[in-house]
């Protein structure tokens, strides 16, 4: 792939100067379509209740699940609503899960005067053996028991369950299924290798010199300022860069100034100001050479709830001079040379990690694809806008590349769907912690990590640069 292309050319760094300097034209993007319009907010009204988004989600998902249930259990299976259930009668029910969790943080529990409880300490996971599942439809709810993995499932998941109502009033689940992968348009064949670079978690403003050096190495490689002719030729095959959130460090979110007297903070500025200036300079270097899509993340200066709206262009006076810079939403979807990308900055996957037993971020990514919903835990444990007409987080179409940013480590996997769908799953690691980005080959849907690290004290040769996969 990328490294193999670089190795095909002779090393030129130590060769005598030449009058004819090699020039490499960047591979053009034949077609590009930004398909993130469903995530753009027109009106911003927070006066509505969140019950509407659950009702809309169930209405939109019900046809997919009824069809999937008949494929899974046979066309003769009866699909009923909860109000139509009869004791001991086996049937299928479609509904939305609610997971009752004793350890789930609750502001009502914390402020309750009669309980006088101390706030719960933060946990990495909130699952407990006493967790229970409740299935809801438009009219009723019923507790579930039987063959169903309580610890793995989360609130907001729409699924179909097969079983019967028992004398204790609970629904005994014998089997269950999800909507599975959405239909997918095949990607057109490409005749040459071209790459999309995925980066997340630059963490600017954190004060780490190693991270800053790695970021500059990344910029220099992409723009062809680093390496010999082999590396520069390979860099010319990078057709687009996607920055998947957390461009600023968590340390820029300090709110200590709120608790200080005004005369102490009158001449100080927010820590994020210098970080945004630094980001503007980095985007200037990148967008002068290659198209760049910038997604916001948890620590970036935009709205906190999903879908996060694009960063404001006034923060980047230098980089916005180039039309190659695109400020996009989180989640973000686009079609690049016929390959459909869909990704988030990682909040959806991190939230499911906290409220389920799934440990692997790549497994969670695949699970959301099977459930056919980007963020089922929103709005219960993850903030989102109170939509009431449609739920934009439902997959209308299966992507070819599905990624999430700011994960602890790199991972990639190709999965197949029941209708020959092919999807590349990518977990993009936090760059400030790992100095690692990901390259996706649009022609083959292969993915490889590429690492950028500075010289350590133990490095005695150029091998310490750590540039490459």
Swiss-Prot record:
Q: Where in the cell is it found?
A: Nucleus
Q: Which InterPro entries match?
A: DNA_pol_a/d/e_bsu, DNA_pol_D_N, DNA_pol_delta/II_ssu, PolD2_C
Q: What is the effect of changing residue 224 to W?
A: Loss of POLD3-binding in a yeast two-hybrid assay
Q: Any keyword Electron transport?
A: no
Q: What is its main location?
A: nucleus
User: Which top-rank group of organisms is this from?
Assistant: Eukaryota
Q: Per the similarity annotation, which family is this? A: Belongs to the DNA polymerase delta/II small subunit family.
Please state what the protein is called: DNA polymerase delta subunit 2
């Amino acid at each position: 792939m990328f490294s193999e292309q670089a190795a095909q050319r002779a090393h030129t760094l130590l060769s005598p100067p030449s009058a004819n300097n090699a020039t490499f034209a960047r591979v053009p993007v034949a077609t590009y379509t930004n398909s993130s319009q469903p995530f753009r907010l027109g009106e911003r009204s927070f006066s509505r209740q969140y019950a509407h988004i659950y009702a809309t989600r169930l209405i939109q998902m019900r046809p997919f699940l009824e069809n999937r249930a008949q494929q899974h259990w046979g066309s003769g299976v009866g699909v009923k609503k909860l109000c139509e259930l009869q004791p001991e009668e086996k049937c299928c029910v479609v509904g939305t899960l609610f997971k009752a969790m004793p350890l789930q943080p609750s502001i009502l529990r914390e402020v309750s005067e009669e309980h006088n409880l101390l706030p719960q300490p933060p946990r990495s996971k909130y699952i407990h053996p006493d967790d229970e599942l409740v299935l809801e439809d438009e009219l009723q709810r019923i507790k579930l028991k039987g063959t169903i993995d309580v610890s793995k499932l989360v609130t907001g998941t729409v699924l179909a369950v097969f079983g019967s109502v028992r004398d204790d009033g609970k629904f005994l689940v014998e089997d269950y299924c999800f909507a599975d992968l959405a239909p997918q348009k095949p990607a057109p064949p490409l005749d040459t290798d071209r790459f999309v670079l995925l980066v997340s978690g630059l963490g600017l403003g954190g004060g780490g010199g190693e991270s800053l050096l790695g970021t500059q190495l990344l910029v220099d490689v992409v723009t062809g300022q680093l390496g010999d002719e082999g590396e520069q030729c390979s860099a010319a095959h990078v057709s687009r860069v996607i920055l998947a959130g957390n461009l600023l460090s968590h340390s820029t979110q300090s709110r200590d100034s709120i608790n200080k007297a005004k005369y102490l903070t009158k001449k100080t500025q927010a820590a994020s100001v210098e970080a945004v200036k630094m980001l503007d300079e980095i985007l200037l270097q990148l967008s002068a050479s290659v198209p760049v899509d910038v997604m916001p993340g948890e620590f970036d200066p935009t709205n906190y709830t999903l879908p996060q709206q694009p960063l404001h262009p006034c923060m980047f006076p230098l980089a916005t001079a180039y039309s190659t810079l695109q400020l996009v939403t989180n989640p973000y979807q686009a079609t690049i040379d016929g390959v459909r990308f869909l990704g988030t900055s990682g909040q959806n996957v991190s939230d499911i990690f906290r409220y389920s037993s799934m440990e692997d971020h790549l497994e969670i990514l695949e699970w959301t694809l099977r459930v056919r919903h980007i963020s089922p835990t929103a709005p219960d444990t993850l903030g989102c806008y109170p939509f009431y007409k449609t739920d934009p987080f439902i997959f209308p179409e299966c992507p070819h590349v599905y990624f999430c940013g700011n994960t602890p480590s790199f991972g990639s996997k190709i999965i197949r769907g029941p209708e020959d769908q092919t999807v590349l799953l990518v977990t993009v690691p936090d760059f400030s912690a790992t100095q690692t980005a990901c390259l996706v080959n649009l022609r083959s849907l292969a993915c490889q990590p590429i690492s950028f690290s500075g010289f350590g004290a133990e490095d005695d040769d150029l091998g310490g640069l750590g540039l490459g996969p």
